[in-house]
A protein has these predicted regions:
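Walker B catalytic acidic pair
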Residues: 201
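Active-site-proximal or metal-binding-adjacent scaffold patches in catalytic folds
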Residues: 1-195, 205-246
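Walker B beta-strand of ABC/ABC-like P-loop ATPase nucleotide-binding domains
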Residues: 198
Length: 246
């Protein structure tokens, strides 16, 4: 039976990459499955019943692709520990410093107008992004509801409640009960882009669907919305840092 050590010898990975590679046997698997994730690393899932030579041949053919995936995971994990953070929506930026803690997982982030000090627990690579996301959520709670309220008053469009959420695919939403949800990662977008999303949800207070009437209402509220929409579609693919997404 093929083991993790067997494939490690075949791939000849460096010590840093070995930690990102694993092999698992599954009763449900009928073929070799390759999984790549910043959280779990690169995983090879093998059927419990398999021919060793068949596995070795397939893995050998994919050696360069596997190495490429592992390299991407390694680089993505490095982005979990940024040296600086900018919130374009508000125009503020901070230099980020780290302080080691080994006995337990600390939860306090120290902030000055120009610096963030993040307690780092080295045994958990995801501890830093967890703290940074908590900090980002607090900044979003401070800014986005007030900004939405100001725009709401300006346009005479009134909502019921606003919630700041962690959302992977939606930047915002508006319900039939006039409740608005906003993605905290809007703080990482330029002001015109985050304002576009807020105007988009305010327009839904008039027209819930995306019919032509909705876009006409949005253009009334924000005449240049098309430029910001194009920018949003471009930036959302690569602008949000890994620490805010994981």
């Amino acid at each position: 039976m093929i083991t993790q050590d067997t494939l490690l010898k075949l791939l000849d990975l460096c010590k840093e990459d070995i930690e990102l590679f694993s092999v698992r046997h599954s009763n449900k698997a009928r073929r070799i499955i390759f999984k790549s994730s910043i959280r779990t690393g690169f995983e090879v899932v093998l059927p419990v019943l398999h021919e060793d030579n068949w596995v070795l041949e397939i893995v050998a053919k994919r050696k360069s692709k596997i190495e490429s995936h592992i390299s991407e995971i390694r680089e993505s994990r490095r982005e979990l520990k940024p040296q600086s953070i900018e919130l374009p929506t508000t125009g503020h930026s901070w230099r980020v410093t780290y302080k080691d803690f080994n006995d337990k997982k600390p939860v306090v982030t120290t902030e000055t107008p120009t610096t963030l000090q993040i307690p780092e627990y080295r045994e958990d690579v995801f501890h830093v992004p967890t703290l940074l996301q908590k900090w980002l959520h607090e900044r979003a709670l401070e800014y986005l509801p007030k900004r939405l309220e100001n725009l709401s008053t300006t346009h005479g469009l009134y909502y019921n409640k606003v919630r700041i959420k962690r959302q992977k695919t939606l930047w915002g939403s508006c319900s039939s009960k006039r409740n608005i949800n906003l993605n905290r990662n809007l703080m990482l977008m330029p002001l015109d882009v985050s304002d576009y999303v807020l105007h988009h949800e305010l327009a839904h207070l008039k027209v819930l669907n995306h019919s032509s009437g909705f876009w006409e209402e949005l253009e009334r509220l924000l005449p240049n919305y098309k430029d910001s929409l194009i920018k949003l579609k471009y930036l959302q693919k690569k602008h949000i840092p890994q620490w805010a997404l994981i």
